């Protein structure tokens, strides 16, 4: 049984006046790994306190020498690692040298004997990383001979050489792969340049091992190390030496080296250098010759991957990676006649690998197929009207790839991933269910497969048609019928909408829709019908162009959707409503005009039978249905006819509304009836759906219910407040009170939706705003219970200010009187309470700042100070959306002041230095790293104001504002970060002025300064580059979207703007 740990006993460890008790430390470390409860907490607390002690590192050597416990030794290394990462620059030089020599001697001692090295693998890996951390701080300035030292030592002992390879590999990764954000840009560049300039010694060592060593483990680790070097070393070391030949002819055929060698070849294949084209082609040819010996012509890749060993599975993965990387980068080089057989062999391998039932392997292949078909589409631009056979003659590259691409088409259609719109799925138990959680990976895979299949269809639409028609026939005749086969086929059919020319699409879809409708009648059983229904709905929803051109099909499809709205199988009604609204948006005007051979418009039929259509739908589905019908009515251009349609359209909800209002006018307590309140909430949601679709035209319905709705709002508010006064705040959780809150929220939602869509600001201002402000502002202000205040009031006001702009400037003081101080009082105690009020409060502030800035200049100074303080409070939030909003408000405020010079000077005198102090406090706070781009924009603007003498008032006791701000900022930083040298601060402050006209450079300057601060405080810097990652992704997405718009069928029809769709 383990001995108990006492706090007195453990406290001895923290007494640095005594000799360290190694046995006691071992005991405490063991408690951490074996004990529970209070003993565990005590042990963890002691070890953490010891680790954080500034002198703890001085005990590391004793621990490593005398402890017999590997866990204790690892703990000691963590202490050492921490001091290197956080305090290296403040340690005396002799102590740095001592630590360096000590770590090197430990590594040599542990790695010189292969048996000892194997026994201490984890310990040694930690030592290696500690050495790399030292190198990042010492090399090359304080350790010029490091490369020659490590290379020289490697020649003395194979075991030592193995470990030195690991150190070099780790160093390469740290400098070239992970340096961003951990060391300053200048330091990173210096390390990279040094490593490149001294690489010849490392290369000689690697080559010597690979050519001469008989030690398999050493060869393997050398290949792993070389793999890390290949993406940055000077290209001459790869192409002007025997390196590639050694890899291909010496190691690729050896099973234990095969995978790492293929990885090396993939890394080389990913390089680009036009002057080495011949070398690349030779590399490909030689590798393919070797692969034929290894893989053969007819290996069943799927079987190997499914039933083979880990090594064999990895081979399939690495083979895919090599072929895809090479062909994507250099495929055109090997289209030459002398390499064409090798290219065909490579393509056949890729087709076989594409059939492997593993998503990650398939994604690798998909990326290449996508790049190939996109390149063929773009590089040999063609007329879509050209016959397929002629097309093959005109475009030789397409002719060459055609047989392979036919196989790829078949695979894409057979494996098509599930689109986001499909809600009915087969689960892992073989049951047909509604999908509730979106699978992001599946959606992304679908988008990539869809794009690839669209290109494939453009390249040969006849072949796509042939494969799909054959597969559909096999579904209908039952020879291949299964849920999976039908799903993948229909998902593929839906994915190529717009890729056929219109005539081909018509012929193809007539067959598809008829066959699917027939299949729905033919198959029995609810599960079968649910799967077939979901596929019909997905396919028809993807082809609005076809439906617009073929009225009979459009009517048949919509009637089929109405039929599905009565089908109670999970997910079918949802999909029916979702598909209906998509079709309504894209085909809206065809429903409001009389079509050939019809007695009336289809919208008339829908409105006449609406109650029977929606009788089996859930409330949320009814709202979707109403929104869909609203889009149809919005297409009616005759206002008189449109008003008549709206009246009929809203007849059902209005009947219930009128009944409730009538009964409430006789007895106001009726508005406490649960059924009535629930109905009111649902009716208001229906109105919101109608308003979204109708836009400004909804005004006729809004006018009908507006004043009654505001009265209901007031009474409901009174009822909530009374309930809270009698029963306490927890009454908010009772169903009736919750439903009352829904009524208030939906009232505000409805007003916000309509105002944001209205096209007559004066009409809104004159007729709707006065009663609205009287109703909701007074209610918000009077409510003494913060939790009962409706946050939607704030966001509604923000939307109204954003829409009406200068029209509402005169009302801003009234709005602020009602909501500003009472809300600020709710959110200024901490950063967490009332999150929705918090966000909406700043949305309102942002809207007023952007559109009614004069209102800020007209409020008393005391109230403006509250506004300013609330903005500062905003950007101190760790909630990123609130912090960003605060920074945006501040920057816009500074820009607005530029238009009001008199007010600006007074503002600068009062607030300028305060803003600097507050911004620097968040810039240097690690929880605000994501705000760095906005911090840089604001600070650069402020420093440019000072430098360009835009501030004429004195900011401090020194007449020259520039000198004063330099001294102020330097003093601010020096007092906050005492470990910084005067020179570091001086260089930083000088840069703030020198770079204030270049925001990007200014931001990099800030970032380097943050790295210097964190380097000495030991904090993680990896998040400093978050914005770059986000911006790069956003730019990539934008460019891709622009490209997709130019290729027919590439965008989902529902992503196209209206002017490109509803013709």
UniProtKB/Swiss-Prot annotation:
Organ and tissue specificity: High expression observed in the developing embryonic brain, hind gut and posterior spiracles shortly before dorsal closure; and in the ventral nerve cord, midgut and somatic musculature shortly after dorsal closure. Expression increases when the tissue is well developed.
Localization: Nucleus; Nucleus membrane
Pfam families for this protein: CRM1_C, CRM1_repeat, CRM1_repeat_2, CRM1_repeat_3, IBN_N, Xpo1
Residue ranges occupied by any Importin N-terminal domain in the UniProt entry: 43-109
Recorded GO MF terms: nuclear export signal receptor activity; small GTPase binding
Keyword Nucleus listed: yes
Region (Disordered): 1034-1063
Gene Ontology annotations of biological process type: centriole replication; mRNA transport; nuclear export; nuclear pore complex assembly; protein export from nucleus; protein transport; regulation of cellular response to hypoxia; ribosomal large subunit export from nucleus
Biological role stated in the UniProt entry: Receptor for the leucine-rich nuclear export signal (NES). Binds cooperatively to the NES on its target protein and to the small GTPase Ran in its active GTP-bound form. Involved in the export of dl, RpS2 and the pre-40S ribosome from the nucleus to the cytoplasm. Plays an important role in nuclear pore assembly by mediating nucleoporin condensation and biogenesis of annulate lamellae. Required for the function or maintenance of certain tissues such as brain and gut.
Family affiliation: Belongs to the exportin family.
Protein name: Exportin-1
Native organism: Drosophila melanogaster (Fruit fly)
Highest classification ranks of the organism: Eukaryota, Metazoa, Ecdysozoa, Arthropoda, Hexapoda
Gene: emb
């Amino acid at each position: 049984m383990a001995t108990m740990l006492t706090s007195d006993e453990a406290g001895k460890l923290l007494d640095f006046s005594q000799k360290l008790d190694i046995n006691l430390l071992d005991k405490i470390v063991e408690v951490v790994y074996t004990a529970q409860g209070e003993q565990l907490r005590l042990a963890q607390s002691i070890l953490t306190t010891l680790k954080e002690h500034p002198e703890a590192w001085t005990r590391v050597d004793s621990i490593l020498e005398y402890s017999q416990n590997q866990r204790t030794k690892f703990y000691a290394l963590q202490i050492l690692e921490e001091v290197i990462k956080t305090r290296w620059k403040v340690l005396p030089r002799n102590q740095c040298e001592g630590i360096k020599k000590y770590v090197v001697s430990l590594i040599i001692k542990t790695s010189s004997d292969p048996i000892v090295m194997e026994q201490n693998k984890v310990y040694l890996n930690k030592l290696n990383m500690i050495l790399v951390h030292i190198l990042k701080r010492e090399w090359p300035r304080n350790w010029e001979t490091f490369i020659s030292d490590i290379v020289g030592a490697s020649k003395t002992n194979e075991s030592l050489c193995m470990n030195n390879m690991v150190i070099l590999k780790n160093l390469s990764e740290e400098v070239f792969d992970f340096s961003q954000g951990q060391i300053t840009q200048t330091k990173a560049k210096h390390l990279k340049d040094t490593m490149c300039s001294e690489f010849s010694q490392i290369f000689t060592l690697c080559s010597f091992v690979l050519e001469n060593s008989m030690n398999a483990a050493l060869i393997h680790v050398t290949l792993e190390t070389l793999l890390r070097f290949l993406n940055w070393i000077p290209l001459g070391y790869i192409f002007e030496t025997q390196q590639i030949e050694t890899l291909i002819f010496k190691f690729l055929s050896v099973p234990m080296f095969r995978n790492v060698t293929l990885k090396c070849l993939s890394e080389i294949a990913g390089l680009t250098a036009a002057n080495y084209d011949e070398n690349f082609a030779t590399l490909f040819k030689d590798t393919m010759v070797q692969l034929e010996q290894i893989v053969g012509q007819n290996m069943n890749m799927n079987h190997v991957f499914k039933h083979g060993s880990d090594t064999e599975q990895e081979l399939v993965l690495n083979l895919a990676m090599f072929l895809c990387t090479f062909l994507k980068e250099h495929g055109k080089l090997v289209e030459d006649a002398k390499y064409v057989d090798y290219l065909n062999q490579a393509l056949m391998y890729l087709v076989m690998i594409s059939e492997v039932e593993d998503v990650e392997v398939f994604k690798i292949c998909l990326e290449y197929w996508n790049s190939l078909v996109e390149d063929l589409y773009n590089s040999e631009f063609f007329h879509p009207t050209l016959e397929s056979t002629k097309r093959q003659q005109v475009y030789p590259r397409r002719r060459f790839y055609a047989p392979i691409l036919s196989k790829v088409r078949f695979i894409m259609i057979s494996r098509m991933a599930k689109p986001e719109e499909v809600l009915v799925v087969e689960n892992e138990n073989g049951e047909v269910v509604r999908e509730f959680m979106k699978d992001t990976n599946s959606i992304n895979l679908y988008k990539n497969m869809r794009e690839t299949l669209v290109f494939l269809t453009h390249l040969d639409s006849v072949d796509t048609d042939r494969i799909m028609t054959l597969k559909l026939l096999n579904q209908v005749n039952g020879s291949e019928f299964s849920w999976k086969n039908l799903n993948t086929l229909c998902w593929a059919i839906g994915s190529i909408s717009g890729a056929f020319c219109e005539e081909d699409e018509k012929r193809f879809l007539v067959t598809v829709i008829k066959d699917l409708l027939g299949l729905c009648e033919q198959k029995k059983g609810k599960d079968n019908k649910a799967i077939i229904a979901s596929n019909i709905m997905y396919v028809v929803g993807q082809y609005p162009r076809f439906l617009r051109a073929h009225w009979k099909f459009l009517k048949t499809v919509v009637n089929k959707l109405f039929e599905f709205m009565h089908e109670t199988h999970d997910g079918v009604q949802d999909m029916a409503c979702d598909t209906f609204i998509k079709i309504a948006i894209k085909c809206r005007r065809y429903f409001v005009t009389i079509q050939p051979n019809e007695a009336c418009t289809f919208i008339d039929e829908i409105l006449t039978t609406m109650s029977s259509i929606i009788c089996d739908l859930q409330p949320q589905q009814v709202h979707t249905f109403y929104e869909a019908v609203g889009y149809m009515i919005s297409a009616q251009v005759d206002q008189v006819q449109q008003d008549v349609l709206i009246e009929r359209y809203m007849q059902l909800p209005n009947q219930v509304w009128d009944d409730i209002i009538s009964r409430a006018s006789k007895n106001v307590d009726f508005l406490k009836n649960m059924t009535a309140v629930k109905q009111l909430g649902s009716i208001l949601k229906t109105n919101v759906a109608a308003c979204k679709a109708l836009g400004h035209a909804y005004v006729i319905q809004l006018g009908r219910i507006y004043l009654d709705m505001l009265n209901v709002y007031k009474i409901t508010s009174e009822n909530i407040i009374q309930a809270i006064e009698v029963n306490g705040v927890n009454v908010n959780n009772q169903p009736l009170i919750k439903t009352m809150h829904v009524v208030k929220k939906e009232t505000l939602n409805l007003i916000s939706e309509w105002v944001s869509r209205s096209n007559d600001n004066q009409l809104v201002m004159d007729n709707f705003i006065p009663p609205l402000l009287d109703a909701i502002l007074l209610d918000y202000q009077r409510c003494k219970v913060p939790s009962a205040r409706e946050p939607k009031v704030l966001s509604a006001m923000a939307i109204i200010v954003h829409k009406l702009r200068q029209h509402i400037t005169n009302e801003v003081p009234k709005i602020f009187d009602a909501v500003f101080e009472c809300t600020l009082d709710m959110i200024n105690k901490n950063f967490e309470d009332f999150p929705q009020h918090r966000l909406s409060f700043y949305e309102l502030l942002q809207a007023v700042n952007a559109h009614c800035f004069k209102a800020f200049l007209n409020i008393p100074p005391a109230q403006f100070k509250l506004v300013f303080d609330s903005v500062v409070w905003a950007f101190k939030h760790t909630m990123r959306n609130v912090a960003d909003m605060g920074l945006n408000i501040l920057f816009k405020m500074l820009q607005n002041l530029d238009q009001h010079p008199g007010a600006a000077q007074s503002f600068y005198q009062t607030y300028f230095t305060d803003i600097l102090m507050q911004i620097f406090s968040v810039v240097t706070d690690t929880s605000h790293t994501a705000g760095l781009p906005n911090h840089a924009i604001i600070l650069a603007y402020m420093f440019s104001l000072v430098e360009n003498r835009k501030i004429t008032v004195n900011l401090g006791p020194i007449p020259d504002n520039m000198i004063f701000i330099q001294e102020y900022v330097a003093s601010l930083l020096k007092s906050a970060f005492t470990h910084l040298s005067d020179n570091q601060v001086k260089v930083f402050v000088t840069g703030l002025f020198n770079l204030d006209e270049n925001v990007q450079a200014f931001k990099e300057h800030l970032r380097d300064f943050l790295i210097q601060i964190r380097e000495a405080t030991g904090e993680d810097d990896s998040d400093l580059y978050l914005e770059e990652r986000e911006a790069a992704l956003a730019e990539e997405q934008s460019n891709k979207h622009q490209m997709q718009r130019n290729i027919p069928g590439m965008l989902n029809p529902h992503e196209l703007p209206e002017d490109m769709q509803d013709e």
